[in-house]
A protein has these predicted regions:
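Substrate-binding/catalytic subdomain of NAD(P)-dependent oxidoreductase enzymes
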Residues: 44-142, 147-149
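Conserved small/polar residues in nucleotide/adenosyl-binding loops
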Residues: 163-168
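Rossmann-like NAD(P)H-binding beta-loop-alpha module
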Residues: 2-54, 65-66
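Short beta-strand segments
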Residues: 21-24, 130, 153
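An anion-binding loop in the catalytic cleft
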Residues: 151-162
């Protein structure tokens, strides 16, 4: 998603206080298949690899490390301070089961791997990467398949959603 240039140029007068996104198309593809088709993790991983979405060693994607590195970069940009990805809590999708997806559906939610960074008073920052349950009202709820999206909130911008496919 082309977000770095806007953060460095178009949005420099804006104080960005939140960036939340689906930053990895591979994991979003896998979770979409699990949710809509009822497929299990191992099956969708093999399918993602066969389609060229997942690497032979998918650890960086499925453990959330790729999304974690990306949110660390974005966190650094919005805060003006160095954010090390190793300081961010990171949980991937390897423990998500078919049963989890059934419960999410029963509750009227879906499960997405979100990377989120939020600024608080005093330029304090909180960032996390983890599977989250989203209700249909959430702007990232309908981002499926290999698509990525970033929700940005700023004091001048308000809410903005950037959306693209990016898993190949």
């Amino acid at each position: 998603i082309p977000i770095i240039r806007p953060l460095n140029s178009s949005l420099t007068a804006d104080e960005i206080d939140e960036i939340t996104g689906i930053l990895n198309g591979t994991t979003n593809y896998m979770l979409s298949k699990m949710f809509y088709e009822g497929a299990d993790y191992d099956t969708v991983l093999k399918e993602a690899q066969a389609n060229g979405y997942a690497e032979r060693n998918p650890e960086a994607d499925v453990e959330g490390y790729d999304a974690c590195r990306k949110i660390a970069i974005l966190s650094s940009l919005i805060s003006g301070q160095q954010v090390d990805f190793e300081d961010i809590y990171c949980e991937g999708i390897t423990k998500i089961t078919v049963e989890d997806m059934k419960y999410a559906k029963a509750m009227g939610t879906t499960i997405k791997l979100l990377a989120s960074s939020r600024r608080y008073a005093g330029n304090r920052l909180h960032a996390i990467v983890a599977p989250c349950m989203l209700y249909p009202e959430h702007p990232l709820y309908n981002v499926n398949d290999v698509f990525n999206a970033i929700f940005v909130h700023g004091n001048v911008l308000g809410d903005c959603l950037l959306y693209t496919s990016d898993a190949a």
